[in-house]
């Protein structure tokens, strides 16, 4: 039996995000998101969440201005997920993610003389359909699976 209170809470949370923060948020029927799932969406972000999305436990999804996140149908995220999007992340249908997975389509600019900069470089990430990503995997900018 589904925890219907949590499903209702997620519907309210996602609709408030769409109304006040991210007008380009498209949500199909989300199955279950952990109550500690945190969405930080900038105003011009484009986010599409597919049908039957399930996320256990806590996680964080950050989508910057003019960035795009697409998550297909029947995707499962285990706990301690982190997705940071400054360009584009696309996740296909039927994907499964183990605990502790991190997805970053961006990185700080770094050089030996000046160290770490506040600037970022980014490149799209594409994860195809029916992929299984094991525990504690880190997926970086420009990756195609």
Predicted features along the sequence, with ranges:
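Extracellular/periplasm-exposed beta-strand and loop segments of Gram-negative cell-envelope proteins
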Residues: 107-108
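A short acidic, helix-capping loop that chelates divalent metal ions and anchors anionic groups
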Residues: 112-114
């Amino acid at each position: 039996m589904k925890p219907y209170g949590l499903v209702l809470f997620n519907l309210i949370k996602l609709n408030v995000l769409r109304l006040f923060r991210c007008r380009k948020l498209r949500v199909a029927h989300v199955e279950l998101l952990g109550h500690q799932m945190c969405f930080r969406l900038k105003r011009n972000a484009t986010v599409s969440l597919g049908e039957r999305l399930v996320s256990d436990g806590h996680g964080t999804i950050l989508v910057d201005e003019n960035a795009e996140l697409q998550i297909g149908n029947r995707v499962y995220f285990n706990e301690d997920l982190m997705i940071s999007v400054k360009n584009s992340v696309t996740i296909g249908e039927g994907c499964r993610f183990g605990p502790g997975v991190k997805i970053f389509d961006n990185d700080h600019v770094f050089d030996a003389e000046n160290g770490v900069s506040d600037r970022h470089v980014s490149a799209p990430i594409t994860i195809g359909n029916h992929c299984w990503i094991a525990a504690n995997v880190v997926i970086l900018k420009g990756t195609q699976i």
